């Protein structure tokens, strides 16, 4: 594993990227921002699950950016997988604060 984290097993994007999560009752959406200095710049759109195949859309978008290394893509996609699995298996309908506590290294926003 590249960049391991004791809590979840992944340290996202080697500090070059931030994963943003839109936590909703009926969907979860995932986007990636690039860290530029002390700010961030949107790198992808928000991709929604289960409305669409967010993981596959994110994978395609990341692969289109040749300057992102394979290790970084794998790391970002593994984190997306963890979030989607959590939302599907136990997080759907749970409060935003609970999801934030589960994934403190990610940026969350939402309606609940």
UniProtKB/Swiss-Prot annotation:
Keyword Protein biosynthesis annotated: no
GO cellular component, one term: ribosome
Record bears the keyword Lipid metabolism: no
Pfam families reported for this sequence: PSRP-3_Ycf65
GO molecular function, one term: structural constituent of ribosome
GO biological process: translation
Swiss-Prot/TrEMBL keywords: Ribonucleoprotein, Ribosomal protein
Protein origin, superkingdom: Bacteria
Quaternary data: Part of the 30S ribosomal subunit.
NCBIfam families to which the protein is assigned, alphabetical: PRK02724.1
Family: Belongs to the chloroplast-specific ribosomal protein cS23 family.
Cross-referenced PANTHER family: 30S RIBOSOMAL PROTEIN 3, CHLOROPLASTIC, OS04G0461100 PROTEIN
Cited function: Probably a ribosomal protein or a ribosome-associated protein.
Protein's UniProt name: Probable small ribosomal subunit protein cS23
Organism (species): Synechococcus elongatus (strain ATCC 33912 / PCC 7942 / FACHB-805) (Anacystis nidulans R2)
